[in-house]
From Swiss-Prot:
Organism taxonomic ancestry: Bacteria, Bacillati, Bacillota, Bacillota incertae sedis, Caldicellulosiruptorales
Annotated keywords: Glutamine amidotransferase, Hydrolase, Lyase, Pyridoxal phosphate
HAMAP family per the UniProt record, alphabetical: PdxT
Domain of life per record: Bacteria
Protein name according to UniProt: Pyridoxal 5'-phosphate synthase subunit PdxT
Main function: Catalyzes the hydrolysis of glutamine to glutamate and ammonia as part of the biosynthesis of pyridoxal 5'-phosphate. The resulting ammonia molecule is channeled to the active site of PdxS.
Cellular component GO terms, alphabetical: cytosol; glutaminase complex
Catalytic reaction equation(s): aldehydo-D-ribose 5-phosphate + D-glyceraldehyde 3-phosphate + L-glutamine = pyridoxal 5'-phosphate + L-glutamate + phosphate + 3 H2O + H(+); L-glutamine + H2O = L-glutamate + NH4(+)
Listed pathway(s): Cofactor biosynthesis; pyridoxal 5'-phosphate biosynthesis
Organism expressing this protein natively: Caldicellulosiruptor saccharolyticus (strain ATCC 43494 / DSM 8903 / Tp8T 6331)
Binding-site residues for L-glutamine, renumbered to this chain: 47-49, 106, 134-135
Enzyme Commission number(s) from the entry: 4.3.3.6, 3.5.1.2
NCBIfam families: PLP_synth_Pdx2 (TIGR03800)
MF GO annotations: glutaminase activity; pyridoxal 5'-phosphate synthase (glutamine hydrolysing) activity
Length: 188
């Protein structure tokens, strides 16, 4: 069994926890540095990226997470988590954890009322997955070392080494493809 940390300040925390449990692994709620001890991977859920980033800095988690990333710990950001992991946020600088060579634009699909679900084919899975977009960011550029796993008009899921980002919320669907990919394929 693998221990998967879920950053637990806000957002789809409980939904990610349930997906991890469905796969037979152990979720660990991460709110302080000590919670990172012994985990095998870390999920940064959606929510409000500015607020989550502020908590990461205030709690000292930012530096510890960056250190773990340098050591090769797999990490996955969904929606706001993808913003946190971005090296560049369009017209705003960089994410708090700038580990992923992408340029991202906040709320690019519109406001809460513009939220939508879409079926998207993912070649890596050879399956169509349901994607839920809620005030979702848009990846507007990717670096040469970034693999695009899924896209609509622009990339919606990317992978760079041990860092995964999705601009949508896989935790809000009945499917478990993305969580399985993260836990079973990315975490050794």
């Amino acid at each position: 069994m693998k221990k998967i940390g879920v950053l637990a300040f806000q957002g789809g925390v409980i939904e990610h926890v349930k997906k991890i449990e469905e796969l037979g692994h152990i979720p660990v709620l991460v709110k302080k540095n000590e919670d990172l001890e012994g985990i095998d991977g870390l999920i940064l859920p959606g929510g409000e990226s500015t607020t989550i980033g502020k908590f990461l800095i205030e709690t000292g988690l930012k530096d510890k997470i960056l250190s773990l990333a340098e050591q090769g710990m797999p990490m996955w950001g969904t929606c706001a988590g993808a913003i946190l992991l971005s090296k560049s946020i369009k017209n705003q600088g960089s994410g708090v954890l700038p580990l992923l060579d992408i340029v991202i634009e906040r709320n690019a699909y519109g406001s809460q009322i513009d939220s939508f679900r879409k079926e998207v084919f993912v070649p890596r899975f050879n399956k169509t997955t349901e994607c839920v977009f809620i005030r979702a960011p848009k990846i507007v550029d990717v670096g040469s070392n970034v693999e695009v796993l899924a896209q609509l008009d622009t990339p919606i899921a990317v992978l760079q080494g041990t860092i995964l980002a999705t601009t949508f919320h896989p935790e809000l669907t009945s499917q478990n493809y993305w969580h399985s990919f993260f836990v079973e394929n990315m975490i050794k």
